[in-house]
Amino acid sequence: MANSAQARKRARQSVKQRAHNASLRTAFRTAVKKVLKAVEAGDKAAAQAVYQESVKVIDRIADKGVFHKNKAARHKSRLSAKVKALA
């Protein structure tokens, strides 16, 4: 249990930030699933459009520090390869 006022405040902040980060991770997973679903459907135009949106989401989350930039790059690369394979 936090004893000082500073420690109590940091505990409150960490709870709030944890919830926010969880919502960002959920948005990330949803974006990736949308791309994979479009790829499985075989719709190249839709897959490219959804991929562009997912890249924005992934980059935004990496910029905020929720994920490491290398993790973001890895996911973008793998999604891009799947979209390009539809040709």
UniProtKB/Swiss-Prot annotation:
Protein name stated in the entry: Small ribosomal subunit protein bS20
Alphabetical list of InterPro entries matching this protein: Ribosomal_bS20, Ribosomal_bS20_sf
Matches recorded under Gene3D superfamilies: Ribosomal protein S20
Domain of life: Bacteria
Range of residues in the leader sequence: none
The keyword RNA-binding is assigned to this record: yes
Residues spanning the membrane: none
Gene behind the chain: rpsT
Family: Belongs to the bacterial ribosomal protein bS20 family.
The UniProt record lists the keyword Ribosomal protein: yes
Biased composition (Basic residues): 7-19
GO cellular component, one term: cytosol
Organism the protein comes from: Neisseria meningitidis serogroup B (strain ATCC BAA-335 / MC58)
